[in-house]
Amino acid sequence: MTIAPEGRRMLRIEARNAETPIERKPSWIRTKARTGPDYTELKGLVKSGGLHTVCEEAGCPNIYECWEDREATFLIGGSECTRRCDFCQIDTGKPSPLDRDEPRRVAESIATMGLRYATITGVARDDLDDGGAWLYAETIRATHAANPGTGVEILVPDFNGKPELLQQVFDAQPEVFAHNVETVPRIFKSIRPAFRYERSLDVITQGRDAGLVTKSNLILGMGETDEEVLEALADLRGAGCDIITITQYLRPTPRHHPVERWVKPEKFVEFSAEAERLGFAGVMAGPLVRSSYRAGRLWAQAMKRRGVAIPAQLAHLDKESPAAQEASSLLAR
């Protein structure tokens, strides 16, 4: 019996994954720590206030850039997920009881940090009758109420595709409704066994039909081909996805899916161009791009391309600024 570091029995797939050593990253997988006044201030606020962000706790390489933009990401619903995806670092297990005060605390953290844009994501809560829909919706409402000048992007699980649960989130009116497909149909079941590709597309379509700006993400390097990436982009656009981010898979631990390939920046530029051609209103592609990277900028870009006026209280998000991790920026260095 193989034992995981936290003391539990390792799953068969984890033991098989662990037979492959952690891969050496190529030269283009790198970032520079460029701190500025906003990052320094936020760092101090987070430390003094005992606040928790995904940015810090996941060791995101883009924290310096995003915090300079006054953007951050928060995880709700606990630290354990009821589902297991082969790329995801979040633990799988029995979650803690629902914390109904969490929306208020997240909203207060966003206010304390003075964020311009906040991405709120969370774990799947199949243990709850509503799959956690109330928690997601209430966190949007609480954040908007406490921070009228802050954009809110909500990144949700699929709630098993149930319209009545998704509607709770739609009614809270986030600036962006995001659900990540992550990979292509052929390998989807092995990578995300508790999800379904077509169901994820339908979740995005439901968000589109509710009149929201929709968003998804594709992770490359888990066994897909270039042709399958192009097909998935077409599927997403056909489902009504407005914004797409495309990123390189980085293996969190030996127990996770091995990296099948390292996609060069030049290829990311090609995928970005194809996404633009397909009509996505916002595109961000690069090895270290993450789904919440420069999220406020992408939302503003999508609004303009859709011909929708940006609300006055969020006009500060409408600015053109370089994105260091975008593949085209990497090649220009």
Swiss-Prot record:
Binding-site positions, [4Fe-4S] cluster 2: C81, C85, C88
GO cellular component, one term: cytoplasm
Membrane-crossing residue ranges in chain numbering: none
Cofactor: binding details: Binds 2 [4Fe-4S] clusters per subunit. One cluster is coordinated with 3 cysteines and an exchangeable S-adenosyl-L-methionine.
Disulfide links within the chain: none
Main subcellular localisation: cytoplasm
Name of this protein: Lipoyl synthase
Gene: lipA
